[in-house]
Regions:
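Solvent-exposed loop/turn segments at secondary-structure junctions
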Residues: 2-4, 23-27, 67-71, 100-103, ...
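Periplasmic-binding protein-like
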Residues: 1, 16-21, 62-65, 125-136, ...
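Extracellular/periplasmic periplasmic-binding protein-like sensory domains
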Residues: 85-93, 140-219
Length: 219
């Protein structure tokens, strides 16, 4: 709906600058109306996430998503690159489906599904498997169960140390707010305590946070 929203704004106020950070619409669609549209390099990440998973020790890669997300150009293209990267690097690519948190089951239902399914997936595919999901609300239960049952986690779809980790490991970051080195240090400590050392990763800074600052500066 962002593209249509921008279009309506421009009809009434063409002088307003419309900036899109991490838009869900296809790049060519949102770019037709936005003054600037910024998204992470999903093409490179499609390869780099799989490559990093292999360096961490993974032999299989499980991509978890649902039809709505897979209809997006950026997500489906990244998934296709991940599949090819697995083939090139000698890893097995596996696609698993999870409930859409915007469906009738809601966020709670989707998270409960993950809590129940992740242990079964680890048992089925082995602890030498890396898991990746396209939805931010699914990272928390995924991290929690991987710490407990095994498996690898390279990074979140919207990479950031505050996506998934605080909720999964009960990390209070109120005192560290805005201090990314301090946040990363506290998250790392919690991951090690939970048994995820060497099996879990993230970016040093929040992609969304940096994206927003950049758009405000450029706008």
């Amino acid at each position: 709906g962002t593209t249509e929203g921008f279009r309506r704004v421009k009809e009434k106020r063409p002088d307003l600058i419309c900036l899109a950070g991490e838009p869900q619409e296809d790049p060519n669609v949102i770019s037709s109306v936005a003054d600037m549209s910024v998204i992470e390099d999903f093409i490179s990440r499609g390869y780099l996430i799989v490559h990093t998973a292999k360096k961490m020790g993974a032999k299989k890669f499980v991509h978890i998503s649902f039809p709505r997300h897979m209809s997006y150009e950026s997500i489906s293209r990244r998934a296709a690159i991940m599949q090819q990267a697995c083939k090139d690097l000698g890893m097995k690519y596996i696609f698993e489906t999870a409930p859409d948190p915007t469906s009738d089951v809601g966020v709670a239902g989707a998270q409960q599904f993950m809590l129940e399914k992740v242990p079964a997936w680890v048992k089925k595919y082995g602890k030498d498997t890396a898991f990746f999901t396209t939805n931010s609300s699914l990272h928390e239960p995924l991290l929690r169960q991987l710490a407990k049952f095994g498996g690898y986690y390279v990074e979140a779809t919207s990479a950031s140390p505050i996506v998934g980790y605080p909720g999964a490991f009960n990390i209070d970051l109120s005192k560290e707010a805005g201090d990314w080195p301090a946040i990363l240090k506290k998250v790392e400590k919690a991951v090690i305590k939970a048994g995820g050392a060497g099996r879990m990763g993230t970016w040093a800074y929040s992609h969304g946070y940096a994206n927003t600052l950049a758009l405000v500066y450029l706008g």
